Amino acid sequence: MEPSKVKKEKNGNASELTAILRARQKVELVKVPLFVEMVEEALENNMSVVVFCNFTETIEALSQRLNTKCIVNGEAKYAKARQQNIDDFQADKQRIILVNIQAGGAGLSLHDLNGNHPRMSLISPSYSAVLMRQATGRVWRDSAKSKSIQKIVFVAKTVEEKVCDSVKLKLENMDLLNDGDLTT
C-alpha cells in the first residue's frame, strides 16, 4: 500500500500499520542484549560482524553497548563518516559495523578482503524481501578471502513471526520469478 493511500484511509488501516511498526521497533530493541552477546562471541572467534537493523534507536543502543561509532545510516549526522566507516571495516581497523538495512542494504561491500577476519552478519528482519536479499549479499562475495556466516534473528511469539512468514513467501516468489521455474 502506498503511503499516500494510507493517510487517506479512514477505516483504521493507518493506525494498524503504525501499531505494527511500533511493535517491530520494540521487538528489535528487545534483541539488543542478544545481538551484543552474538557480536562478542563472534569477535572472540576472530570474526568481524555486520549488524543490520531497521530502526535508529536500535543502532544507537547497540553503538553504546558495543562501544562503536562505526555506523552506516541514512541520517545526516552519519553522512560524512559513512565511507570512512566502510573503509575502516574493510581494512579490519573496525571489527563491528552497524548498518541501517534501508541505508546499507544495496551497493555496499563488506566482505573479507584480507583473510584475517571472516565475516558474520546478524540481520534483524524487514518486511521487504528485496532489502533482506540485499543484506544477505553484503558480506558474501566471490572475491572474499574467507567464508561468511549469516544469521537472521527473529523473535518467536511476536510480530516478527508474521514478518518471517511474509518475507519467506516473498523470497520464494522472487526466486520463482528469477529462476524462471514457474511450472512446479
Range-by-range predicted roles:
Residues 51-52, 153:
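Active-site-adjacent beta-strand anchor residues
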